[in-house]
A protein has these predicted regions:
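Basic, flexible linker segments flanking DNA-binding modules
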Residues: 1-87, 241-251
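C-terminal domain-tail junction helix/linker
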Residues: 170-174, 197-255
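Short small-residue beta-strand/loop micro-motif enriched in glycine and branched aliphatics
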Residues: 118-122, 176-178, 203-205
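RNase H-like two-metal-ion nuclease catalytic core shared by retroviral integrases
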Residues: 1-2, 65-68, 154-156, 162-166, ...
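An active-site-proximal beta-strand-loop segment
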Residues: 81-120, 126-128
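Mobile genetic element proteins and their domesticated derivatives, centered on retroelements
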Residues: 11, 29, 45, 49, ...
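Active-site beta-loop-alpha junctions of metal-dependent nucleic acid enzymes
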Residues: 100, 104, 122-145, 161
Length: 255
């Protein structure tokens, strides 16, 4: 057996470990191999994946969903496309995406931590009213000790410029940041997560044949049973999954 064939065999073992691993790209595959003591260059990994037909097409980018309220007073863009964070729960992103289902549309509203790429809250409903966005935020504050002054960034959709949403952030001592009108790159890391969810899970299914409740379960399981806990995250040290990285970093800082 040639060297590339042996490497490809290891790749298939990695892909077989979890159903969700089937969408591993070159960089995540390289990290997965390194975690098993197999160090290879990106070009070597790419060639082996190409020979084994394991390379994937580029993901589709989801279109923007929320509509700006042009008359509303908007907070400034504080993060200015800087999606890095040195501490957890300090810089958070949110938005809404939709998934077509057999019995309507499912709207998904997450809260994303720039520190480690973790989804710390996920609200879903059959409408995209401001209450959905508010629930996303309040659930996060119930489950996490989010410090005063945490930045919560969104686009300038009417849900996020509503008085109730702003009041909720004020009561939680959060600082609101908002993208410019029509500037999707101002919230690019959140949009990237939606693209990941859809490429790795939603686009693999015909959700128009599934009920809203069935799709809710699929999104929930992907997010909390795979993405947060198992999925290699290339921007984290050693490619650690978001939740694993947060816990590992917390142990080191406490030592």
């Amino acid at each position: 057996m040639k060297a590339w064939q042996k490497l490809l065999a290891q790749m298939h073992k990695i892909l077989d470990e979890d159903e969700e691993n089937k969408d591993y790209g070159v960089r995540r595959m390289q990290i997965a191999l390194e975690q098993r003591g197999i160090k290879r260059s990106l070009s070597t990994v790419r060639r082996a994946m190409a020979r084994g037909n394991l390379l994937h097409e580029d993901r589709r980018s989801p279109d923007g969903l929320t509509k700006a309220d042009k008359k509303a007073m908007r907070p400034q863009n504080i993060i200015k496309q800087d999606f890095s964070a040195q501490e957890p729960l300090r810089k958070l992103l949110t938005d809404i995406t939709q998934i077509p289902c057999k019995d309507g549309k499912l709207y998904v509203s997450p809260l994303f931590d720039c520190y480690n790429g973790e989804i710390i809250s996920l609200a879903m409903d059959t409408n995209m009213k401001k209450e959905l966005c508010i629930k996303t935020i309040t659930e996060a504050y119930k489950n996490f000790d989010i410090p005063s002054g945490a930045i919560i960034h969104s686009d300038c959709g009417s849900q996020y410029t509503s008085g109730e949403y702003k009041k909720t952030l004020g009561q939680l001592h959060a600082v609101q940041s908002m993208s410019g009108v029509g500037k999707c790159w101002d919230n690019a890391r959140m949009e990237s997560w939606f693209a990941t969810l859809k490429k790795e899970k939603i686009y693999q299914l015909d959700t128009t044949k599934l009920t809203v409740e069935e799709v809710k379960t699929i999104v929930w399981r992907y997010t909390f049973a795979y993405y947060n806990t198992k999925r290699i995250t290339t921007v984290n040290p050693d490619g650690l999954p978001p939740l694993v990285y947060r816990k590992t970093a917390a142990k080191k800082s406490a030592a």
